[in-house]
Amino acid sequence: MAAETASGYIQHHLQNLTYGQLPDGSWGFAHSAAEAKAMGFWAFHLDTLGWSVALGLIFLLIFRMAAKKATSGQPGGLQNFVEVMVDFVNGSVKDSFHGRSPVIAPLALTIFVWVFLMNAVDLVPVDWIPQLAILISGDPHIPFRAVSTTDPNATLAMAFCVFALIIFYSIKVKGLGGFIGELTLHPFGSKNIFVQILLIPVNFLLEFVTLIAKPISLALRLFGNMYAGELVFILIAVMFGSGLLWLSGLGVVLQWAWAVFHILIITLQAFIFMMLTIVYLSMAHEDNH
């Protein structure tokens, strides 16, 4: 594979199916990174939106089926699987969440399974889904990315939803005054009222940075790990197009080895996202700083 072809192949697989306003004023799909960039902020990554919604519906369908078929007698395979998942997540919540809220465990379960499903799409060979999109659309140049968590828009959206819950529960539990005091009266304090007033800007700067870092680090951690994993799969796929038998053979070995290792990564990243969400919401429920 020539360097230009390999470079184009990689860029094509790292570009989202973007819909927005083209430079000529019409609306349509971007066929290059330059066109996608020219669309500006109001552009939609339809592949990210479509796959995230579809996998969310699959999650709901599977768990609904398990709930409808649940029995107190001999459980089936699906019921066993769902019960194991629920017990695992419920145990994680009990160990890490010290407040009282009926929504934390269902939220944690939703996050873990949904993120895991979005991550798991990365195990599908990199050319299969893009080629299917080309076959359906009839456009040989249309890009398509199936792994929603390799799009920072998706991970940031999920993280800022968690951030909104952090703010909501902080104000609900501590009150608006308590929340503002948490941001302005810590970590530095003084019994002298004038010194305390002088410390408010410093405290606010430190606490605000700490607060806003939570969703950003939550999003970028998931995005960075999944993006790197996808890039490795793409680079391995380039080996298959090299035309060299030994390099293609090495690609087969690396593909299987990385896929097996990646199963651990996709599970671990879903678990980390879930656990950090639980910990952050637990901190929001604490009365004291």
Swiss-Prot record:
CDD domains cross-referenced by the UniProt entry? ATP-synt_Fo_a_6 (cd00310)
Please give, as recorded in its UniProt entry, the membrane topology of this protein.
Answer: Multi-pass membrane protein
Any single GO BP term = proton motive force-driven plasma membrane ATP synthesis
Instruction: Name the keywords, alphabetized.
Output: ATP synthesis, Cell inner membrane, Cell membrane, CF(0), Hydrogen ion transport, Ion transport, Membrane, Transmembrane, Transmembrane helix, Transport
Matching entries from InterPro entries are given as: ATP_syn_F0_a_bact/chloroplast (IPR045082), ATP_synth_F0_asu (IPR000568), ATP_synth_F0_asu_AS (IPR023011), F0_ATP_A_sf (IPR035908)
Coiled coil feature spans: none
Q: Name one GO molecular function term.
A: proton-transporting ATP synthase activity, rotational mechanism
Task: Name its cellular compartments.
Answer: Cell inner membrane
Q: Which GO terms describe its cellular component?
A: plasma membrane; proton-transporting ATP synthase complex
Membrane-spanning intervals of the chain: 43-63, 103-123, 160-180, 193-213, 232-252, 259-279
The family annotation for this protein states: Belongs to the ATPase A chain family.
Note the subunit structure: F-type ATPases have 2 components, CF(1) - the catalytic core - and CF(0) - the membrane proton channel. CF(1) has five subunits: alpha(3), beta(3), gamma(1), delta(1), epsilon(1). CF(0) has three main subunits: a(1), b(2) and c(9-12). The alpha and beta chains form an alternating ring which encloses part of the gamma chain. CF(1) is attached to CF(0) by a central stalk formed by the gamma and epsilon chains, while a peripheral stalk is formed by the delta and b chains.
Any idea what job this protein has?
Key component of the proton channel; it plays a direct role in the translocation of protons across the membrane.
| Protein name (Swiss-Prot/TrEMBL) | ATP synthase subunit a
| Species per Swiss-Prot/TrEMBL record | Pseudomonas putida (strain ATCC 700007 / DSM 6899 / JCM 31910 / BCRC 17059 / LMG 24140 / F1)
